[in-house]
Amino acid sequence: MMISEKPLGVEESIRQDLEVLTVSRRLVKSVSQKLKKKIHKTEVVEDEEIARGAVNCLSISVGCRVADTGEDFEDSSNKRWSSASEEGKGLMTICGTEETRLDCFSYGVRERFWKKNNRKYLADSGQDYRKHVYLPDDILEMCLMRLPLTSLLNAHLVCKKWQSMANTQRFLQMRREGSFQTPWLFLFAALKDGCSSGDIHGYDVSQDKWHRIETDLLKGRFMYSVTSIHEEIYIVGGRSMDRNSFKSHRGILVFSPSIKAWRKIASMRHARSLPIVGATEVTSEFSTMQTKQNRQDRRFHLSRVGGESDVYEDPHRLSVRRQNRNSADQNGTKSHRLIRQKLDRLNRNSSKRFVLIAIGGTGLFDEPLDSGEIYDSATNTWSEMQRLPMGFGVVSCGIICNGIFYAYSENDKLSGYDIERGFWITIQTSPIPPRVHEFYPKLVSCNHRLFMLSVSWCDEGDGQIGRRNKAVRKLWELDLVYLTWTEVSVHPDAPMDWNATYVSDQNILMGIEMFKIFGQVLSFFTVCDVLTEEASWRHVSRNQRSQKLNLSCTNKTIALLHL
């Protein structure tokens, strides 16, 4: 009996212990749930306080809560309570020497204090802060807008965002209107080792520094002409070596130096080498179809003078001609309507409309051309223009001035093409500036004035010994009202380069001369201000590009842009 009662007592004690243990688990679970609710409520309150911003403890009328550093930073026995708490009523908590080490915070700043002293959190937040440091787009755009061209091109390499921002039409327009651009001179068709290298040499006038732009599109291509408008350079025509023969080009290449981009536009109707080219802006009412009709009507009336009447000709030929004429008029009307519709649609999308003119040059078989073509940027098409006047001769130079394309021939004749009305005008000038025929003259338009540079022998009676052995380059101006030439100035350098090229920038004339002497290629860059009374020339740059060129650039050409 004693043996059986002992196990029963043991089992009873074990069951009681289990019941106590069960109660303890329930108590723990209940306490845990209450603790979670309290923590969640505290976090919500802290978030609300942070959203409202930190409140200065001195501005609270009911007192402040002293920060409880908690078990993370101090021992729990050193916990401090503010005068506003229930446990601290009647106690002075901000006096006494032992309270000097305790800081007073706004309620809900304990988490901030912990973040401030946690090294790992500071390291992570510092990295995140550095990742999100950036300038607003408008301020970044203003900074990029004021950079010089070389620095702006380097900024393109920073990221895709900067590159896309600096290539938009809005950015280029704001840069242009803000007068942040500087003049750049681009030299084409430089010869090296007996052939065209294809490189483009850009000269920053403001910095007096040359830059080389490598490209494979112009390698081996020569005898082309260039012109510039709207921050772009147009390379027109030219030739290249095709195995054992020469190939003439009709295509047009467009180079944008500000973004280092190339593109193509519609090709000319005829292949041309060394054509005389020019570009100018036109109004939205300009139409190449209208100028073509005006030329046909003008030719038609001129051809009928002194001729027979249509009534007395062969009736069959008369009917066929009238039928062809009516069909041509109908086709012309339809094509004109289509072009006008396309023109109106493109004018809404385009900013500024311009035309590109190419006249003269040599054809496929080196024959001189007296025809011309005009390109309309709105329709991206070329159309024939009226031929040069009879007996005009081979065109040697040309320039656009005040809406007139002036062309000068090897026979010392001057003609002007009215771009808006579409016909040539023969201009009789006096006296004709004397010149040495081995040196071609150059027409330049500067500040709505027409100039010509030509090489002539020294005048008699100037005291020079052997005057027939000395040639000078003179600058002449044409009076557009009285059509008379007047000598303006004399270039200080001897005319060693027979293909010296000149461009203008407002009232400044710029010229580049390159020639080979004693086995060395020399280059000179000179400028002239035509607004001054003396109109004197001065040297700007010497022998900077000629060091890497071993041949004189007989076919060189230049273009000026503001970038």
UniProtKB/Swiss-Prot annotation:
Q: Which UniProt keywords apply?
A: Kelch repeat, Repeat
> Is Cell inner membrane set as a keyword in this record?
no
What is the protein name stated in its UniProt record?
F-box/kelch-repeat protein At5g42350
Gene Ontology cellular-component terms listed:
SCF ubiquitin ligase complex
Q: Boundaries of each F-box domain copy?
A: 129-175
Repeat (Kelch) positions are 184-231, 232-282, 355-402
**Gene Ontology terms describing biological process:** regulation of cell growth; regulation of cell size
Q: Does the keyword Ribosomal protein apply?
A: no
Q: What is the organism field in this record?
A: Arabidopsis thaliana (Mouse-ear cress)
